[in-house]
């Protein structure tokens, strides 16, 4: 597995990868699907382009045999590195790639001088929260509303985020 920073040339493949892992029937092959919580798409080519072109952010791609297997969005914020859109192909979930992507995020945090990583997780995703806790992330107690914007998906029920953090040494 190799890791690199995504470019605009990767946008079509990234769009397919992320949406297949989070939404729709294909996402149900993995354990991280949001298909029962949200309709619509997880991201779009325009959103990915905005992420890639930000000066304070990167999308790290995991590839094997020239095929995208996973990715993670990392954005430097005032006091932390924000981690989002952690994605692993549904048929590869549970095989350690998510852990490798988290490790890549921690290395990036160290490189740019961030002492913690912050993320948001939908509160009803108990299995995902438990996964992140096993990886050293803690519930900060902070909650945020789920955005009322179809570009993030259309909630099938009331949703909110919890904020999790991990200290990086």
Task: Identify the residue ranges that each predicted region occupies.
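A short beta-loop-alpha structural element at the N-terminal edge
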Residues: 2-16, 24
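C-terminal "cap" of GNAT-fold acetyltransferases
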Residues: 49, 115-118, 122-129, 135-169
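A short, internal acetyl-CoA/4′-phosphopantetheine-binding micro-motif in the GNAT/acyltransferase core
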Residues: 61, 86-93, 121-122
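A short helix-loop-beta-strand connector motif used in the catalytic cores of GNAT acetyltransferases and
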Residues: 43-60, 82, 157
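Conserved GNAT-fold acetyl-CoA-binding loop/helix
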Residues: 19-48
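Conserved acetyl-CoA-binding loop-helix of GNAT-fold acetyltransferases
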Residues: 88, 94-107, 134
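Conserved beta-strand in the GNAT
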Residues: 61, 67-75, 82-87
